[in-house]
Amino acid sequence: MSKSASRARLADIIRTRSFGRGEITLASGRKSDFYFNLKPTMLDPEGAALLAELTYETLRDEKVDYVGGLEMGAVPLAGAIAQLSWLKNHPISAFFVRKKPKEHGARLSVEGLAKGESLAGKRCVIVEDVTTTGGSAIKAVEAVKESGAEIVLVLTMVDREEGATEAFAAAGLPFRSLYKASEFLNV
């Protein structure tokens, strides 16, 4: 399937499985009359494969060591990208950032690394399913930077176009999205 055909098919899946209308309170605290819940798309076999394919194509030339983001939205996505990268003989490992470190065990903020493995000096991409203001992704960025990593890109599947671009620019973080909310609202 061509990239444009993959993109169109994924948009159809998102529209069917993950987009809705109706008043909702977003993670940012804002109210909205539409929403995206990408988990049904990320956990659908075809949706996961297409998200991984399109995201991997975006990352392929970035010389990325790791991909991850804030739990819960980044977990299925990072896992799918890691799996596809292995199949493409260009492995990119995955991790996720806890919203709050566990109060028992190793008390880690960043999960998925093997014993003795570190993000120090590694090139990382932060992924997110849906971005509104950028606040959640910036929390993940801060935790990963504390681990000594370099953030090369913040990549979201859907940008709600409500300030994230400006927030990432102000933080000096490159930002891209696979889709803009307006692509689903104007159909």
From Swiss-Prot:
Binding positions for orotate? 132, 160
Signal peptide bounds: none
Q: Name one GO molecular function term.
A: orotate phosphoribosyltransferase activity
Q: Which residues bind 5-phospho-alpha-D-ribose 1-diphosphate?
A: 98-99, 102, 104, 128-136
Indicate yes or no for the key word Transmembrane.
no
Question: Entry's NCBIfam families?
Answer: pyrE
Assembly information from the UniProt record: Homodimer.
State the family it belongs to. Belongs to the purine/pyrimidine phosphoribosyltransferase family. PyrE subfamily.
Role noted for this protein? Catalyzes the transfer of a ribosyl phosphate group from 5-phosphoribose 1-diphosphate to orotate, leading to the formation of orotidine monophosphate (OMP).
Any idea what this protein is called?
Orotate phosphoribosyltransferase
- What's the source species for this entry? Rhodopseudomonas palustris (strain TIE-1)
User: In the UniProt record, what gene is named as encoding this protein?
Assistant: pyrE
